Each structure stands twice: as structure tokens, then as C-alpha cells.
Amino acid sequence: MKTFLILALLAIVATTATTAVRVPVPQLQPQNPSQQQPQEQVPLVQQQQFPGQQQQFPPQQPYPQPQPFPSQQPYLQLQPFPQPQPFPPQLPYPQPQSFPPQQPYPQQQPQYLQPQQPISQQQAQQQQQQQQQQQQQQQILQQILQQQLIPCRDVVLQQHNIAHASSQVLQQSTYQLLQQLCCQQLLQIPEQSQCQAIHNVAHAIIMHQQQQQQQEQKQQLQQQQQQQQQLQQQQQQQQQQPSSQVSFQQPQQQYPSSQVSFQPSQLNPQAQGSVQPQQLPQFAEIRNLALQTLPAMCNVYIPPHCSTTIAPFGISGTN
């Protein structure tokens, strides 16, 4: 029994040793199977004692069969991906240009245009109203400028003798104050509007002339009315007196004849606040006087075209 056990242990040890030796051998077979065949035959001759165990190892030769990986070459067939080039058949998408059948929509537009015709008339009325408002605003601005430029007007009147536009002789202190006020107003006006400011000064002087002429005419009318009243009173008194005093009536009858030349219509109230076309030469003269006086006094630049413009700001019948 002991010998049998010893033999069994030896057999077990031999099997383990052979397995430890023979396991790496099949791993080397796929690399160089032609060279390893003679090496395998040598241990088989030495270990013929265990024929039953040697028959198990030959089936390990199928391990090199994993070489069918080259059969993965069909993956190269994935190259047909460039076949998505058939996208060009998407050209039919521009076919939605069939929108031209929507032409009936513009046919409805003339229906809307017809009621819009009265709106154009309303727009014309609105434009006229806007123009009137702008003219009114310009007149208001002109009046404001004239009021602001009254010191400049008085300075020009003091330095130059203008017919029917005489002013009171001012003291030197008041005259210097007027100069300072005039220059302050001119410097506040932007350069683009300074030419209009000079025109407004000339316009204010002409308005001053008209006012003085109207006042003179009113005074003359009042004097004439007083003379008429005096004549009427004298006539009444003479009628009550004896006929011997009738000879004094002849020289006194000359007064009413002179009253015919002065009528209230001569005041021309419609001409107030505007320069008449017949006054343009006078306006040009006064403007030149203002241009000679104000820019040098206030050190203000006035463009050259200001002395050549024909239509001044504020003339009646012009913009």
C-alpha cells in the first residue's frame, strides 16, 4: 500500500510538473509554430510514461484559430458613407416659389387705396396747418428777437442819423450799458443765426420809423381836428357878431382845405409789423449801417453773404 501511495504521489507530482512546463508551450506556438514542433517532440519522448496526459494537450492547438480577425476586413466596407451625396436631390425645396399665386392679395390693395384718398386731403390740410403754425412761430420768434435786440437798435440809432427814426440823446453811461446789452445778446445767438439777427435789427429800425411816422401823422390829425374845432367855434362866434366882422372870415377859411391831404387811411394798419417791398432800398441802407457798427463793436463774425441777401427776415409777402 505504501508503495502504491508513493507511486500515486509521484504521478501527481509528475503531472503538475508537466503541466507547469507544457502550459507556456502552446502560447509560443502561434508565433513560430514551424520551429516549435521539433521542440515539442523532445519532451514527448522523455515523458512517454504518461500517455494519457499527453493526449489532452493536442486539443490546445485551436488557440491560434483566433486569427480570423482578418475577416474584420468588411469594416472597410463602411466607406460607402460618402454615398450621402444624394442630398442634391433636395433642390426641389426652392419649389415653394409657387407664392406667385398669392397675387390676388394686391388686388385687395386698391380697395384700401380708395378710402385713403380723403386721407391725402387731410394730410394736405395738416401740412397747411403746420406751415401756418411755423409762420406764426417765426413771427413770435422775430418779435422776441426784436425785443432782445432793442439795445442794438438804439445803438445804431445813436450813431447814425436816420430819417424819421430819431431817438433821444443818451448819456454816455446809458449808451455804454446799451452797448454791453447788445453785445451780450449777439454773443448768445449762434453763428448761423447772426445774419438774421442783423436783419432783425434793421427790421426793428424800420418798424421804429413806421411807428414814429404814424405818431407824427396822428399828431397832425389831432392838430387838424383841433384847428377844425377852433374854426367851427370861431364861425359860430362870427355868426353871432355884426356883419362888419365878416371880412375876417376869408383868411380863416383856408384851414379846412389843407385837411383833405391827411386821411386816416394813410396810417395803413395792414403794413404794421412788416417791411413793404418799396422799403427794400431803405432796409438795405439800414442793414449796411448795422453791419458797419455791430460786428466791430461786439467782435462778432458776420458772414459776407449777409450784406448781399435780398429777402430779409420779416418782409411781408416773403418767407
Curated annotation (Swiss-Prot):
Composition bias, Pro residues: 59-71, 81-104
Biased composition (Polar residues): 267-278
Region listing for Disordered, in residue ranges: 28-125, 258-278
Entry comment on modification after translation: Substrate of transglutaminase.
Other comment: The alpha/beta-gliadins can be divided into 5 homology classes. Sequence divergence between the classes is due to single base substitutions and to duplications or deletions within or near direct repeats. There are more than a 100 copies of the gene for alpha/beta-gliadin per haploid genome.
Alphabetical list of InterPro entries matching this protein: Bifun_inhib/LTP/seed_sf (IPR036312), Bifunc_inhib/LTP/seed_store (IPR016140), Glia_glutenin (IPR001954)
Annotated signal sequence range: 1-20
Higher taxonomy: Eukaryota, Viridiplantae, Streptophyta, Embryophyta, Tracheophyta
Keywords annotated in UniProt: Allergen, Repeat, Seed storage protein, Signal, Storage protein
GO molecular function: nutrient reservoir activity
Protein name (Swiss-Prot/TrEMBL): Alpha/beta-gliadin A-V
Family recorded in the similarity comment: Belongs to the gliadin/glutenin family.
Magnesium recorded as keyword: no
Role of this protein: Gliadin is the major seed storage protein in wheat.
Organism encoding this protein: Triticum aestivum
Alphabetized Gene3D superfamilies for the sequence: Plant lipid-transfer and hydrophobic proteins (1.10.110.10)
SMART domains: AAI
Compositionally biased spans, kind Low complexity: 28-58, 105-125
